[in-house]
Amino acid sequence: MPNPSSTSSPYPLPEEIRNLLADVETFVADILKGENLSKKAKEKRESLIKKIKDVKSIYLQEFRDKGDAEDGEEYDDPFAGPPDTISLASERYDKDDEATSDGAQFPPIAAQDLPFVLKAGYLEKRRKDHSFLGFEWQKRWCALSKTVFYYYGSDKDKQQKGEFAIDGYSVRMNNALRKDGKKDCCFEISAPDKRIYQFTAASPKDAEEWVQQLKFVLQDMESDIIPEDYDERGELYDDVDHPLPISNLPTSSQPIDDEIYEELPEEEEDSAPVKVVEQRKMGQDSVHHTSGDKSTDYANFYQGLWDCTGAFSDELSFKRGDVIYILSKEYNRYGWWVGEMKGAIGLVPKAYIMEMYDI
């Protein structure tokens, strides 16, 4: 029998065989990875790996050509090496295409250390190289941190497998990526002249949530105008990076009785802000603690996300990391709460603070 390693086939590999090998590879390198196998099962696994290696050696040129034509990337052989190195070979296969499409590089960071995570969870990520013998979809723990999309092998990883800045991209649902029961769970992130990233979520609802969160951040990046995101009551949420200044706060959703305020035509532009400030100050006179016992009221302890300097005397100024105790959320609809810090009481932009305790 000729040595497979020295034999090359003049015929292309049939699609049915490619599909079969892909299924076997998935089972051997992915499903059985890390399983506590019996001695007999381990021997069978090694036998299957050897057979796949033999087939690869016969169709080596075709395999390489397909990989180069599709992605222009070098493919890492998942089964290189003797059988006793199978775990290392499988890990090499799991290594994703980590280079970013635009050449930008981000420092390694552990999944648990990502700051300001807006959305996170497990997704199936489509491989850039998903040709013959390659897993088309791989499970990845993904996170949107500020304006960078990271993906990891798991949420315990100390370093990302890849990442990309979403600036300039667009996102949409795409049910044409798969033909199975998950076709309505797919979405893609794309941009002209850049790599397309395609994902499958656990459910259509989860996919929609990813799309909406990405769209919200992208809209915020494209304009200095705060995107309007309404909750069920139709109230406005303030954008994190651009809180509403006092002078631009809406006065009220209800019409204001003209008899309360005297009309001053020459000061018409300033009349609305004065009313809002008066309303805030009147409400602040009756500020009360949100809980009876401050020492155990952990839910109302917050800390500064960024440095904030108050524009008015009734606003608190604080630094990133400062501890603020929230006394009242009376102005929640305007994006402001009433807080106390080091004995001083004042208005705090809620977009500039985060919960101190995870309750």
From Swiss-Prot:
Modified positions (Phosphoserine) in chain numbering: 5-6, 9, 87, 90, 223, 286
Biological processes, Gene Ontology terms: B cell activation
UniProt keywords, alphabetically: B-cell activation, Cytoplasm, Phosphoprotein, SH3 domain
Family annotation (InterPro entries): PH-like_dom_sf, PH_domain, SH3-like_dom_sf, SH3_domain, SKAP_fam
Region (Disordered): 67-88
Comment on protein domains: The SH3 domain interacts with FYB1 and PTK2B.
Family membership: Belongs to the SKAP family.
Purpose: May be involved in B-cell and macrophage adhesion processes. In B-cells, may act by coupling the B-cell receptor (BCR) to integrin activation. May play a role in src signaling pathway.
Protein's name in the database: Src kinase-associated phosphoprotein 2
Gene: SKAP2
